[in-house]
């Protein structure tokens, strides 16, 4: 048991060192996936032998570790193949070789240089979707070789050009237009160039408009991101951001009781707000205050002393390794730390975006000390906040 725990600790230390190093070599990305493979194989072995937790790491189910190990092995094979291609000396980041990006449409392709394409429906900028255009694709062809192609956008959708010169669309704007546009009209905006729904011609390469101008009339058709290159056919539709929902109506004013301004001011005059240095010093949940005038105001002022937190956003495995290092080396600089978690879709349990992890502190001074002393990977985003009820 101790030997297994030490082995897992060693793997996770190597992983976190890679995250902090932020190497852009393809060899480092191969090492990253090999370490993930070893980690999942070790956890799978532990689960088979009835071990539920190894050090600070809970052991996942057999199916979970098996699937993660298979994905890691697949990525190792693809990256080893890419190392034998002319593109092995290019800069490659963890994001460029991530499983999520590799599997995003078009699938089984390496992608770089993301850019946002916005689509507005019915001329309403509040009713819009955003799509990702990948500036560079590296795609495996029928001969088992990797070839580079680039992407472009026109009124129909986002495409790349295959080896025969065909436009292969991996985003079709009309699919969502049928759902979100009442009259079927939509406008495509990319790099400050606008394509109107009146455009029906075939895609043609055009030069982007200056960044400070948006043409009132649409160009002949396309706003390309690059010249023609080779690549196989793949046609899929990217995930998208849903249009904004209608605003929530407020209750009628007659249903809300309001005290007269002079009455409220006089009643609140004896309530002392916390000093700036006291904000964030509270470590327990605020109880219910006695009933009476301005009870909610008194609660809010008391809640201003709730304990501070930070929310870290990044890859799930990256956050897990970071949590291990924080607990083993910097435990005196925070109060407690959560497991990694994700937002889920409103209609299913599918994870959305990157992982998150919360760290709670006794006070703002401890949080400031943590942020100044603990090195965090630059690929990890940090958000500050306070929670009522922690």
Swiss-Prot record:
SUPFAM superfamilies given in the database record: E2 regulatory, transactivation domain, Viral DNA-binding domain
UniProt region (Transactivation domain), positions on chain: 1-202
Post-translational modification comment from the UniProt entry: Phosphorylated.
Main localization (coarse): host cell
Signal sequence interval, chain numbering: none
Subcellular location: Host nucleus
Function of the molecule: Plays a role in the initiation of viral DNA replication. A dimer of E2 interacts with a dimer of E1 in order to improve specificity of E1 DNA binding activity. Once the complex recognizes and binds DNA at specific sites, the E2 dimer is removed from DNA. E2 also regulates viral transcription through binding to the E2RE response element (5'-ACCNNNNNNGGT-3') present in multiple copies in the regulatory regions of the viral genome. Activates or represses transcription depending on E2RE's position with regards to proximal promoter elements including the TATA-box.
Protein name, as recorded: Regulatory protein E2
Organism: Cottontail rabbit papillomavirus (strain Kansas)
Species classification: Viruses, Monodnaviria, Shotokuvirae, Cossaviricota, Papovaviricetes
């Amino acid at each position: 048991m101790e030997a297994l725990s030490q082995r897992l600790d060693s793997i996770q230390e190597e992983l976190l060192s890679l995250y902090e190093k932020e190497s852009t070599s393809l060899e480092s990305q191969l090492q990253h996936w090999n370490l993930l493979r070893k980690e999942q194989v070790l956890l799978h072995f532990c689960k088979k032998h009835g071990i539920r937790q190894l050090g600070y790491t809970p052991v996942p189910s057999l199916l979970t570790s098996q699937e993660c190990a298979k994905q890691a092995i697949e990525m190792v094979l693809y990256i080893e193949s890419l190392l034998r291609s002319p593109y092995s000396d290019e800069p490659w980041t963890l994001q460029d070789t991530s499983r999520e990006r590799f599997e995003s449409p078009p699938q089984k392709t390496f992608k770089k240089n993301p850019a946002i394409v916005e689509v507005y429906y019915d001329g309403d900028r509040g009713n819009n979707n955003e799509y990702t255009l990948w500036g560079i694709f590296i795609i495996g062809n029928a001969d088992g070789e990797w070839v580079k192609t680039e992407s472009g956008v026109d009124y129909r959708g986002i495409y790349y050009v295959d080896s025969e010169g065909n436009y292969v669309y991996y985003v079709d704007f009309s699919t969502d237009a049928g759902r979100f546009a009442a009259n079927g009209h939509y406008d495509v905006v990319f790099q400050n160039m606008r394509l109107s729904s009146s455009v029906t011609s075939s895609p043609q390469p055009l030069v982007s408009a200056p960044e400070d101008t948006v043409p009132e009339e649409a160009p002949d058709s396309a706003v390309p991101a690059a010249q023609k290159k080779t690549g196989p056919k793949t046609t899929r539709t990217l995930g998208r951001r849903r249009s904004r929902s209608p605003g929530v109506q407020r209750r009628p004013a007659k249903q809300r009781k309001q005290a007269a301004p002079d009455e409220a001011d006089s009643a609140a005059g004896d309530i002392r707000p916390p000093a700036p240095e006291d904000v964030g010093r509270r470590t327990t949940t605020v109880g219910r205050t006695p009933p009476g005038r301005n009870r909610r105001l008194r609660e809010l002022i008391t809640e201003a002393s709730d304990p501070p937190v930070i929310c870290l956003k990044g890859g799930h495995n990256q956050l897990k390794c970071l949590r291990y290092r924080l607990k083993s080396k910097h435990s005196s600089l925070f109060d407690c730390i959560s497991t990694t978690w994700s937002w889920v879709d409103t209609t299913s349990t599918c994870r959305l975006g990157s992982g998150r992890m919360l760290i709670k502190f006794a006070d703002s001074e401890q949080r400031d000390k943590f942020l100044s002393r603990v090195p965090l990977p630059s690929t990890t985003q940090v958000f500050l906040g306070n929670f009522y009820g922690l």
